[in-house]
Structure formats: C-alpha cells, structure tokens
Amino acid sequence: DMGIAIFSLEMSAEQLATRMLSSLAMVDSKNLRNGNISVDEWTSLATAAGKLCGYNMYIDDTSGITVQQMKAKLRRKKNIGLVIVDYLQLMQTTLKTDNRVQIIAEITRQMKIMAKELDVPIILLSQLSRAVESRTDKRPMLSDLRESGSIEQDADIVLFLYRDCLLYTSPSP
C-alpha cells in the first residue's frame, strides 16, 4: 500500500491530525478543540480515528525544512506514493542570498529534481500575493503566486482553489 508523506511547515502534526479527524468525522473542529461533542459526534470521531490509523501516512512538522532534509527523510520511508508540502514560502535553502525570488526559484528547482529522483509526485502548496485582493476579479492567476516565476516554470501543473460563492455573496440581513 502506497503512503502519503505530509510536510507541514505551518501547523504542528497534532493540529493537522485534529483537522483531518474533524474533517473525516464531519465534526466542527472548534467543538473538537473545546470538547463540546455530542454522543453521535463521539461515535463519528471514533470511526474516523480508526480509519486515520489505518492510513499509511507520515506527517513531519519540522519548521524551516530544506529540500535536502526532506529528501533524506523520504529516502528512509518506504512506499511513499505522494508528497504534500504546506507550504513553499516557509521552506529554507542553503542559498546565501536575501533575494526571495532566487530562494523560491532554488527551492522549486530542487523539488522538481527530488520528485524525479524519488519518482514521486509532489503537491507543493504556495501562498498567493496580496495583488489578488486589489482586483475586481478575484480569480487567481499565475502572476499571483508569491515570489513566482519559477513556480510556474518548474511545476507540471498549477492549480488554484477558488469559490465564487464565497467572494460574491451578499451578507445576510
């Protein structure tokens, strides 16, 4: 069974597991955190926890990880079929520069090489720049990728999450 490796540079492994659990159980994460859970929700959580434990999943919450460190950890794992990184701009590099565009370019280049060397697909999450907020049309574009250029160059596919209904609904009275 192929597994998933998740590198979460923003959230702790515990926070991520709690989010996954609440999502799988369809229980509000706020209620889960404060313990305000009904009997039915406890049953749902127990079922979801059993499912989660059965997944071949590795979560690493090392902050500021480099591609080299990530690669070393992945080489020690067996049967990883997918790598997810949350998120690009929090990764570090050994490149000696303060130029964020060059740093991101180096990281995306190294990630592309790592994906080929380890023969594994990588989903690399990225922040958007604030430019999207100042436009009338809020649909994200390639130019909205923070410290972009290399992201679209090195990526095989670039996907954006966008929901019209969240941005263009009028407030309820």
Question: Locations of the language-model features?
Answer:
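Short, electropositive alpha-helical surface patch
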Residues: V132-E152
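Cytosolic-facing regulatory segments adjacent to core modules
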Residues: G3-N79, T93
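Substrate-engagement module of ASCE P-loop NTPases
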Residues: I103-I122, E147-D154
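Conserved nucleotide-binding/hydrolysis micro-motifs of P-loop NTPases
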Residues: M11-E14, G64-T66, Q89-M91, L128-V132, ...
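Conserved P-loop NTPase nucleotide-binding/switch module
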Residues: R19-M26, Q89-R109, R135
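Conserved small/polar residues in nucleotide/adenosyl-binding loops
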Residues: Y168-P173
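Well-ordered beta-strand positions
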Residues: I157-L159
